[in-house]
Amino acid sequence: MSIKAEEISSIIKQQIENYHSELKVSDVGTVTYIGDGIARAHGLDNAMAGELLEFSNGVMGMAQNLETNDVGIIILGPYTEIREGDEVRRTGKIMEVPVGEALIGRVVNSLGQPVDGLGPIETTGTRPIEAVAPGVMQRQSVNEPLQTGIKAIDALVPIGRGQRELIIGDRQTGKTSVAIDTILNQADQDMICIYVAIGQKESTVRNAVETLRHHGALDYTIVVTAAASQPAPLLYLAPYAGVAMAEEFMYNGKHVLVVYDDLSKQAAAYRELSLLLRRPPGREAYPGDVFYLHSRLLERAAKLNDSLGGGSITALPFVETQAGDISAYIPTNVISITDGQIFLQSDLFFSGVRPAINAGLSVSRVGGSAQIKAMKTVAGTLRLDLAAYRELESFSQFGSDLDAATRAKLERGKRTVEVLKQDLHKPLKVEKQVLILYALVHKYLDDVPVHDVLRFESEMNTWFDHNHPELLEEIRTTKKLPDEAKLEAALKEFKNTFVPSEEK
């Protein structure tokens, strides 16, 4: 076999032409300090704020402080295996979480990783956790109601789709119950719900998930959890992960409800990180940008205009108060960012008024324009009546010689308070809310004993379901009150069948 020099030279030339030298250039730094969930690294001069960084053991971190000599990093995972002198390299990416329909029904952590033991989440879509909120011209006015199923909220402080309504109160006043009941009521409302649990006990989150599963609400709910036992960076990031998942649905024309339970714990986690990163403390030791921490999160809730699909994110942020002090730093910040607040009071809660909503301090700045016409008609004077009753109640403690008109107002007020009470995890459809409020306003309850009011409501709902479902259907579909003569006749007919407990 003869070797041809031309062939060999052509093969060598071909291989030289096809050779490409690919140099991978990456910025690599060295860990100079590690502890308490944060690290400092030297040599990452080109790192960007919020950029993901990778440690030599595969754990990720996020650049927070860009200083002259080093970079302050919050660590997104276990930090016990990281040592001083370890390598840390730039990734050129910012943090993203998985998004899409595959997340519905799952429980995930702040990084979007499943923690429910049901296997991996099959989705390829991701979104950055930090995004610019929709601008003024991309939005439209709130004009659709979000029915919570809670009479005291839908009647007194209505919430619209795209609104941000703060729920504020001391611990153990039923804040989480309000959120869970609102999620349960979205079953047939074409709404996707995201429940973000920040700094909760793992047993509490488990109970919430089981409640949602028991009522079939996990079919349209995503749970994002950063438990109290997890590092502060994960508590800080959890709300942003939740709203990023929500934005995917909103920009596809869907309606989303996001519950942040609660932002006080997120602010405390951010304070911890900021102090560890040696940022100067301000009021109550919070850093100077703690207002921006919450404003950039809550501004991402919006009702988009029709050209963008008309989707919405409704935000229900929670803030925990200490001994009812709503003038503390974080409560006043979030009150000024949101479109209203629902104040839950421990005195009312322990006196048996549940949900313990203080109608005087609670307000909805935009939801009234989204209330259905029937509800607006029957609930118009309810807030004033309740305020007058509270005033008379405190006044009546000093004297017993009250005139007939005052006594009548007090009796009506007692029945109003009783009507607004509601059992746990039993949200009420809006047509049935309208029915009982109509009966209250039109004096059908004036001669019903106070302790029988809730039984009257329950029996009336059952009676209307069987005898006049068309009236309920009319309220549901037209969103207006049916013919008053028919409604009055039906209510009188039911009233004649109702037997007070004394006469049984």
From Swiss-Prot:
Database matches in PROSITE patterns: ATPASE_ALPHA_BETA
Localization in the cell: Cell membrane
Main location: membrane
GO molecular function: ADP binding; ATP binding; proton-transporting ATP synthase activity, rotational mechanism
Gene3D superfamilies xref list: 2.40.30.20, ATP synthase alpha/beta chain, C-terminal domain, P-loop containing nucleotide triphosphate hydrolases
GO cellular component, one term: plasma membrane
Disulfide bonds: none
A Pfam family per the record: ATP-synt_ab
Keywords on record: ATP synthesis, ATP-binding, Cell membrane, CF(1), Hydrogen ion transport, Ion transport, Membrane, Nucleotide-binding, Translocase, Transport
EC number(s) recorded for this UniProt protein: 7.1.2.2
Annotated binding of ATP, by residue: G169, D170, R171, Q172, T173, G174, K175, T176
Site-annotated residues for Required for activity: S362
GO biological process, one term: proton motive force-driven ATP synthesis
Reaction(s) catalysed (UniProt annotation): ATP + H2O + 4 H(+)(in) = ADP + phosphate + 5 H(+)(out)
Topology in the lipid bilayer: Peripheral membrane protein
Role, per record: Produces ATP from ADP in the presence of a proton gradient across the membrane. The alpha chain is a regulatory subunit.
Assembly mode: F-type ATPases have 2 components, CF(1) - the catalytic core - and CF(0) - the membrane proton channel. CF(1) has five subunits: alpha(3), beta(3), gamma(1), delta(1), epsilon(1). CF(0) has three main subunits: a(1), b(2) and c(9-12). The alpha and beta chains form an alternating ring which encloses part of the gamma chain. CF(1) is attached to CF(0) by a central stalk formed by the gamma and epsilon chains, while a peripheral stalk is formed by the delta and b chains.
Similarity field: Belongs to the ATPase alpha/beta chains family.
Name of the protein: ATP synthase subunit alpha 2
Origin species: Listeria monocytogenes serovar 1/2a (strain ATCC BAA-679 / EGD-e)
Lineage start: Bacteria, Bacillati, Bacillota, Bacilli, Bacillales
